[in-house]
Curated annotation (Swiss-Prot):
One Pfam short name: Triabin
GO molecular function: toxin activity
Organism: Triatoma infestans (Assassin bug)
Bilayer-spanning residue ranges: none
Stretch forming the signal peptide: 1-18
Any one Gene Ontology cellular component term annotated for this protein: extracellular region
Record-annotated disulphide pairs: C25-C134, C60-C178, C90-C106
Protein name: Platelet inhibitor triplatin-2
Domain of life, source organism: Eukaryota
């Protein structure tokens, strides 16, 4: 009887652990108006809001993009934390048949590499973008990128209203103090 109770308890623990660690990120549909040539010509964008609160440095990032010699776009984002500044360089490869979605091979400042998939959920291809990032495991995140680090572009607010999201509940540059 003790053995049955022990095995049942162990099974429940394993199931609970599996459910906690099975959270995955699924890319949402990209913006229909996404224009790669215009979008990747945005000179500098600031992460102004982050859906997830960890890590807080998500909203202390500055994004710049250039074309590499092979024609691929390379995005560099600088993390400006209160105590540390570091850069991450990502080479973006379009996902075939999915305009506005990319697989990004990123080199961290310590030399490590990670791969994330991204989807441009909404953009005007000039002043703002709402970017979803999905790592190979875990929940991922959604970031608001804007050329103006203060305020919220009307297009961002319109998208949030359409989705039923409240931007005031998201982490912002103001609340973190970048």
């Amino acid at each position: 009887m003790k053995m049955i109770i022990s095995l049942t308890f162990l099974g429940i623990l394993m199931l609970a652990f599996a459910e906690v660690n099975s959270e995955t990120c699924t890319l949402m549909e990209a913006a229909k108006n996404f224009d790669e040539n215009k979008y990747f010509n945005i000179p500098l964008a600031y992460a102004t809001h982050s859906k997830n609160r960890e890590p807080e440095t998500n909203v202390c990032r500055e994004y710049s993009t250039a074309r590499g010699p092979d024609g691929k776009t390379v995005t560099t984002f600088t993390i400006k934390d209160k105590t540390l500044t570091s850069a991450v360089k990502c080479t973006n490869t379009p996902i075939p048949g999915s305009n506005g979605q990319f697989s990004s091979d990123c080199e961290l400042s310590a030399g490590n590499r990670i791969t994330v998939t991204t989807s441009i959920l909404a953009t005007d291809n000039e002043k703002y973008a709402i970017l979803q990032r999905c790592p190979t495991s875990g929940p991922g995140n959604i970031l608001v990128l804007q050329t103006n680090k203060n305020g919220v572009e009307q297009g961002v607010q319109n998208y949030f209203n359409q989705k039923g999201w409240d931007i005031s509940t998201w982490l912002s540059r103001t609340t973190v103090g970048c």
